[in-house]
Amino acid sequence: MHSTRNKQLKKLKSWHKNKKAMPAVLASTLLMAAHAQAAETTGADTMIVSANAGESVTAPLKGIVAKESASGTKTSTPLIKTPQSVTVVTRDQMDAQAVSSVSDALNYSSGVVTNYRGSSNRNDEVIARGFRYAPKFLDGLSYGLSGQGSTIGKMNPWLLERVEMVHGPASVLYGQVNPGGLISMTSKRPTAETIRKVQFSAGNQHLGEAAFDFGGALNDDKTLLYRLDGIASTKHEFVKDSKQERIAVAPSLTWLPNPDTSFTLLTSYQNDPKAGYRNFLPKIGTVVEASAGYIPYDLNVSDPNYNQSKREQGSIGYNLDHSFNDVFSFQQNVRYTQLREKYKYLVYTKNADAPATDTTILRRPQKEENEISEFAIDNQLKATFATGSVNHTVLSGLDYKWLTLEKKMWLDRNNDYSFNWANPTYNVSVNDSMLTELSTNERNKLNQVGVYLQDQLEWNQWNLLLSGRHDWSRVDKQDYAADTTTERNDGKFTGRAGLLYAFDNGISPYVSYSTSFEPNLDSGAPGTPAFKPTTGEQKEVGVKFQPKGSNTLLTVSLFDITQKNITSYNSVTRYNEQIGKVKSKGVETEAHTQLTPEISLMAAYSYTDAVTKESYTASQVNKAPSSIPRHAASAWGSYSFHNGPLKGVTLGTGVRYIGSTYGDNAESFKVPAYTLFDAMARYELGSLASQLKGAAVQLNVNNLTDKHYVASCGGDTACFYGSGRTVVATVSYSW
């Protein structure tokens, strides 16, 4: 084993000089996996095989309180013993709150800003600890594109078992991650227990939705398991004459050839023939009242007859687990993903040379095409053993990914398509032949290899976490618009050290230090060379509290993060720019508790002080980046009646507060704070009649008071209204 691993490391080091070594590296890891499957051992069962080995981090979990997670350490570890802040959103929480996006799932989490583009959030964009575009990972591997200046891809939450937020740097295990944190998504997996569920929803905004979830064993000895999830939905957006339509399906299959081996095939396909629209609005008329008042809440800046938005994405991969014996186990995750997006619209633009009033919007036609192809593989060898009185969980890994991003954008800068938002006129004739300026036409390719080593040491009540990783990355940029080709090679070591002491009373104080590294695929103006990778570091102290035998977890953390080479989107030029260094420090508190069998509560508060410390634009230095609230808070509670005339009824309510934010990176204006209220009522119809067991009805109302507000601004030409009241009625049946 050691000689094989040494050969892999030698091949890895030579890759930076010769990429032809990569097939050999991958071949050797696949041979290791094949050997693992064929080996006959008597080790402990894998997570899927054994349902009694404790809480599974991939299987269904009842309630809103998770006690274990693998996202922070890549090993199933109790959260109370993890020296890092991790938020877990369970399937039950997502169902109770009727979330329609991964961003929605994190609405009640600390340290994150979700849906800051309001109803124009066409992708899952999340700000974490003051840093934009928290990257998304699906089943341990990167999914879609999440860089400092852009994000592409949107996963339907119905296909997921849980969504987790790892707060702070996680590059030491995952590689391409910014220091704010990452979003870890876990697919619904096959189970030996039979799952049969259908669900239908309807609501305002012409919502119509049908979903199903089936799973179970395909043979008598339960060595073949399956899961099949799917959803179809259609709804109108709050922007006039703009729609979202979606069909998504995720078949998966697990094979258990022996008690020590499991192989799970994971696939998904999603087609959004109408993928939504990003509705840029001016500051005048949204944040500041114009001469004619405020811009109507449902104003469509573009033209419904011209708009076009499509998204298609699919993936196929597998998870292989094998236990050699009581000490060694091996896991391999592999996935190939492809994603395509097409958009066409009239976008609000600012042109100082064109005549305008505070009610006139100047627009230009714009067309975008994005395509991502990504392959990722992660090989993990785990050893659990003791040296004297010290218990070790050692994880060594080798991962590789390549990602190709092709971007095209056509513009027509003549600005002939203007209208008065106080008296808008639509159905304009747009001449697509005038879209002759190919402002962006490029192909970016990332190759990244990483090796990592981690040791989780436990001695009495002390828990020490030590991790180290080295990455080699290459970014090739072919800029067809500027007729240039650039290549950038980088290598970086990242590390993490965390120390936690678990008191008998359930209090666990901890301290940690970690660094981050992220190759950059963001695009600047034509002719701009490949951006430098970002680097970051974080210092964190915190305390967790989980009373023995309780279903409660409370976390308080203080963090201090610095990131260099960060990029930002310029709302005037419509290009990304590498602005320099940002420092963010703050406090996060979060609590999840099943107080009694009837009462569940969650609450969160965060204070974030983010400041640009270095920038080529002098007016941005020592100023807060846009869209980041200093204060944010939320709370959700529910009560379930188990007896009496209201037996089967669950009532829930929540409140979300987002503090004021700056509207640009120079602090030239502010966007007011806002508070939103949510509510839920559910009735298990089996309490009414035994024949209705498994049937339920549920009503969810978000933004209960239908508050109209500005979610954020990214400049005086890039403001976004928030979503209005949404009402969703759901009927479900499980049998």
UniProtKB/Swiss-Prot annotation:
InterPro entries according to UniProt = Plug_dom, Plug_dom_sf, TonB-dep_rcpt-like, TonB-dep_rcpt_b-brl, TonB_box_CS, TonB_rcpt_b-brl_sf, TonB_sidphr_rcpt
Motif TonB C-terminal box: chain residues: 718-735
Subcellular location(s) per record: Cell outer membrane
Q: Name its species.
A: Dickeya dadantii (strain 3937) (Erwinia chrysanthemi (strain 3937))
- PANTHER family found in the cross-reference section: FERRICHROME IRON RECEPTOR-RELATED, FERRICHROME OUTER MEMBRANE TRANSPORTER_PHAGE RECEPTOR
* Membrane protein topology class: Multi-pass membrane protein
Sorted alphabetically, which SUPFAM superfamilies does this protein's record hold? Porins
Domain named TBDR beta-barrel: residues: 193-735
Q: What is this protein called?
A: Ferrichrysobactin receptor
Question: Taking every annotated instance into account, which residue ranges of this chain make up the domain TBDR plug?
Answer: 78-188
Gene Ontology CC entries for this record: cell outer membrane
Position of the signal peptide: 1-38
Q: Which residues lie on this side of the membrane: Extracellular?
A: 55-82, 117-124, 178, 203-221, 270-285, 321-327, 352-377, 401-402, 433-447, 470-494, 518-537, 561-567, 608-648, 684-695, 716-726
Q: Which family does it belong to?
A: Belongs to the TonB-dependent receptor family.
Which ranges make up the Periplasmic topological domains here? 39-45, 92-107, 133-168, 188-193, 231-260, 295-311, 337-342, 387-391, 412-423, 457-460, 504-508, 547-551, 577-598, 658-673, 705-706
Encoded by which gene? fct
Q: Which GO terms describe its molecular function?
A: siderophore uptake transmembrane transporter activity; signaling receptor activity
